[in-house]
């Protein structure tokens, strides 16, 4: 099963690779933002994104992020491995 995990954008790169540092349940990881970045990457700072296999797939609001994280925890899904 493929599951996207919510993460919050902490920092964005300024190079061609379109990477951002995203925090997922306390773990920071580099995520490609090319699929969701339509303007200035700095506009994504603080936003919640849905992460799947190293890519930010969509921007979500904080309520949706928290609800998704809660649901994943209830399923005993290992959020940190996503």
From Swiss-Prot:
Gene Ontology MF annotations: carbon dioxide binding; identical protein binding; iron ion binding
Pathway annotation from the record: Protein modification; [NiFe] hydrogenase maturation
GO BP annotation list: protein maturation; protein-containing complex assembly
Stored InterPro entries: Hydgase_assmbl_chp_CS, Hydrogenase_HupF/HypC
Xref: Pfam families: HupF_HypC
Annotated site location: Important for interaction with HypD and the precursor form of hydrogenase: 2
Oligomer and partners: Forms a complex with HypD and HypE. Interacts with the precursor form of HybC (pre-HybC), the large subunit of hydrogenase 2, and with HyaB, the large subunit of hydrogenase 1.
Its biological purpose: Involved in the maturation of [NiFe] hydrogenases. Involved in the biosynthesis of the Fe(CN)(2)CO cofactor. HybG delivers iron-bound CO(2) to HypD where reduction to CO probably occurs. In complex with HypD, accepts the cyanide ligand generated by HypF and HypE, and also coordinates the carbon monoxide ligand. Involved in the maturation of the hydrogenase 2. Also participates in the maturation of hydrogenase 1.
Name of the protein: Hydrogenase maturation factor HybG
Phylogenetic placement of the source organism: Bacteria, Pseudomonadati, Pseudomonadota, Gammaproteobacteria, Enterobacterales
């Amino acid at each position: 099963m493929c599951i996207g995990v919510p993460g919050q954008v902490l920092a964005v790169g300024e190079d061609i690779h379109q990477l951002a540092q995203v925090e997922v349940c306390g773990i920071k990881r580099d995520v490609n933002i090319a699929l969701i970045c339509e303007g200035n990457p700095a506009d994504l700072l603080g936003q919640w994104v849905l992460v799947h296999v190293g890519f930010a797939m969509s921007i979500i609001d904080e309520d949706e992020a928290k609800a998704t994280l809660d649901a994943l925890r209830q399923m005993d899904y290992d959020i940190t491995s996503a």
